[in-house]
Regions:
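Acidic, polar-rich low-complexity tracts and alpha-helical solenoid repeat scaffolds
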Residues: 2-8, 27-297
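Bacterial N-terminal signal peptides
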Residues: 13-25
Length: 297
């Protein structure tokens, strides 16, 4: 269930990037080439994709490619297929697709997206130098949604090298009113805390942790911010504050187990052992593969 949620969020971001591609294309000058669907089978793939029928979308696309039904959108189709495979955790297969697009001299827009996704794959696999090298190949042809993700990826690479101050500076310089601004703020809060500025970082996360969230993606991010706040408060020997933050987390969210574990620790620190047992007993009945559930056993 948890893995499915992460896949869905990743695919939503691909959808946002695709939407940006078509939006930018629709507002270009009259003499510029229009981004129109010339192959009906590619249009069918996009229809399923934007309806959130991702499995149908990728299988339809693979069949269409096999029978050479998307000749006018061959590179775009490969970027889409690679992005979906990456979202499903198939990093090797996705990486091969993006590498082939680069090798065969795809258009600058396609090439930039291929390099970006290669950088993302390498970061996820822990190849930081290779991820940096791939990201450095990206020029200025990314759609706005991916340009924002590029900034987030760069900040994550800095944090992976423990350059938290550098990551915080990079994140603080990013635009504040964008579709992914909440992710920027979340990462900024984490970077500030790890850079030693707990007060500022916690303030950023606290604001995010109390915001109204219009969909599950942002509700999950809000829960994540509150869990981070709770554990930072525990680190700072503030169990009462930690409990307040962790109480905001939904019991059925992706981050509920960690929140329950932290809530128990907060209660124990406040000399309330009976109250600590309540979340820990609940955790003991949950998924044995979850680290928080295992720690409560």
């Amino acid at each position: 269930m948890r893995r499915r949620g992460h896949v869905h969020l990743a695919l939503r971001r691909i959808a946002a990037a695709l939407a940006c591609v078509f939006a930018v294309a629709s507002t270009t000058a009259a003499d510029a080439p229009k981004h129109e669907i010339q192959d009906p089978h590619y249009g069918d793939t996009l229809f399923h994709f934007f309806q959130d029928h991702y499995f149908t979308s990728i299988t339809t696309l693979m069949v269409s490619e096999h029978f050479d039904r998307v000749p006018h959108h061959a590179d775009e189709a490969e970027v889409l297929r690679g992005g979906m495979l990456l979202s499903y955790g198939m990093q090797r297969e996705a990486g091969e697709i993006f590498a082939q697009l680069i090798e065969r001299g795809a258009s600058p827009a396609v090439r930039d997206r291929a390099w970006f996704y290669l950088a993302k794959i390498r970061y996820q696999r822990g190849y930081l130098d290779e991820a940096d090298a791939a990201l450095a190949q990206v020029e200025n042809h990314l759609p706005p949604a991916l340009e924002e993700e590029r900034g987030l990826l760069q900040a994550n690479l800095l944090m992976a090298r423990a350059d938290y101050a550098g990551a915080a500076a990079a994140l603080a310089a990013m635009p504040g009113k964008t579709p992914g601004a909440r992710y920027v703020r979340y990462n900024l809060g984490i970077a500030l805390i790890r850079a030693g500025d707990s007060a500022r970082g916690s303030a950023v996360l606290d604001a995010l942790g109390q915001e109204k969230a219009e969909n599950e993606e942002f509700r999950s991010l809000r829960d994540r911010a509150n869990v981070a706040l709770g554990f930072e408060a525990l680190t700072e020997n503030q169990p009462k504050a930690a409990r307040g933050y962790l109480e905001r987390v939904r019991l059925k969210s992706l981050h509920a187990n960690k929140a329950l574990l932290g809530f128990g620790w907060a209660a124990a620190a406040l000399k309330e052992p009976k109250l600590a047992l309540v979340p820990w007993l609940e955790l003991a009945q949950r998924d044995v593969g979850d680290s928080a559930a295992l720690e409560a056993r």
